[in-house]
Each structure stands twice: as structure tokens, then as C-alpha cells.
């Protein structure tokens, strides 16, 4: 039996649709658990997906580039599933640019932000926040923010502009390396079926 970690929220419906197209059915479904004949799905916070795999509770999971880089876990990443692409960006108040000297940066991703600052040679004070990061420059808590954006609309609404793109975020299929060894046949079979469904869906999409 395969155990999967599924991220709650915007990716949940997409992932579950792919699983059902792959041929899995679920006899029991709740907000935290989906159970079928050959599969169990744990519905978890996106940031918790790698934790479930690292600790051996789940064999396969789905999570974004942002989570993988923030958590810095060693998981197998065979391919990603097509979703709306978003970006991790550095942003600040419109027209002010990047300040000289020490920079106060608010973010939900302190590890990603720290490494980014180091690559730029900046002296930064990182302010970890759990939500509403775009409020930090308005309130005077930070000079800049590092956050995820898809369309840039929320940034514009708060009079912020993108100053740098740090990386593109995709949704990765991730595999526990131990499971890949001990359940290789099951894992490989699942990945092949999933990839086939994804490729079929892509081929069915109308071309512009």
C-alpha cells in the first residue's frame, strides 16, 4: 500500500483529480484522510509534506519549489505536475528601489531569504512572518519583502513592485528515498501511471 502526503488548499483538488484519473478510488474520505484499496492519502499543510516523507510516514508527496528550498530536504524529485506557475520575488514600496546598508526583509521563507541575501552580499535583518507579508513595508516593520506572487495583483494593490525574481515555483512530485528502495515496484508503477495521465491531459489541451 502506498501512503501519499497531499497538500491542502489550492493544489488539493488538482492532485486528487489526477489520482482518480490514475485509477485510484476512495472508500473513505474526510478532511484529513482519504483511504482506498491500495492507497492512503494524508491531507496536510503544504509546508508539512516534506516532514511526512522524511520521517517515513508517507512514500510520495506533492509540494512546491518554495517548500523544498525552504525545508532543504533530500527527496527524490522525478517530475512536476502542471499547475499555474508562480514566482518567489523580492518586492518593495513602489519607486523606492533597494535601500543601501542593512535591509529589513519580512518573509514567510527565512531560509530562502537568508541564502538569497548571502548570494547578493547583503547585510540583512530577516523578519519571519506567518501571513500578510505585504503589510510589513506599509506598517514600517520592513523595508522589503520576499514572497510568492502569481499575477502580481496583490503587490500592486499594496503599492509594492517586484525588484527581483528569485526563482520560479512549480509543483513537484517528491519521493521518500527509502520508499523508493523498499517499495520500488509500487512507487515506479504509480509514477508511470501518474505521468501518463499528466501527459495525456497536456496533449488534450487546446493549442493557441
UniProtKB/Swiss-Prot annotation:
What are this entry's molecular-function GO terms? ATP binding; ATP phosphoribosyltransferase activity
* Higher taxonomy: Bacteria, Thermotogati, Thermotogota, Thermotogae, Thermotogales
Top-tier EC class: transferase
Its biological purpose is as follows:
Catalyzes the condensation of ATP and 5-phosphoribose 1-diphosphate to form N'-(5'-phosphoribosyl)-ATP (PR-ATP). Has a crucial role in the pathway because the rate of histidine biosynthesis seems to be controlled primarily by regulation of HisG enzymatic activity.
Q: Where in the cell is it found?
A: Cytoplasm
| Cited SUPFAM superfamilies | Periplasmic binding protein-like II
Its Gene Ontology cellular component terms are:
cytoplasm
Q: Does the keyword Nucleotide-binding apply?
A: yes
What are the alphabetically sorted keywords of the record?
Amino-acid biosynthesis, ATP-binding, Cytoplasm, Glycosyltransferase, Histidine biosynthesis, Nucleotide-binding, Transferase
Assembly information from the UniProt record: Heteromultimer composed of HisG and HisZ subunits.
* Reaction it catalyzes: 1-(5-phospho-beta-D-ribosyl)-ATP + diphosphate = 5-phospho-alpha-D-ribose 1-diphosphate + ATP
What's the family?
A: Belongs to the ATP phosphoribosyltransferase family. Short subfamily.
EC number(s) per entry: 2.4.2.17
- What protein is this chain from? ATP phosphoribosyltransferase
UniProt remark on domains: Lacks the C-terminal regulatory region which is replaced by HisZ.
Q: Name one Pfam family in it.
A: HisG
Question: What processes in GO biological process is this protein linked to?
Answer: L-histidine biosynthetic process
Q: Which organism is it from?
A: Thermotoga petrophila (strain ATCC BAA-488 / DSM 13995 / JCM 10881 / RKU-1)
* Pathway it works in: Amino-acid biosynthesis; L-histidine biosynthesis; L-histidine from 5-phospho-alpha-D-ribose 1-diphosphate: step 1/9
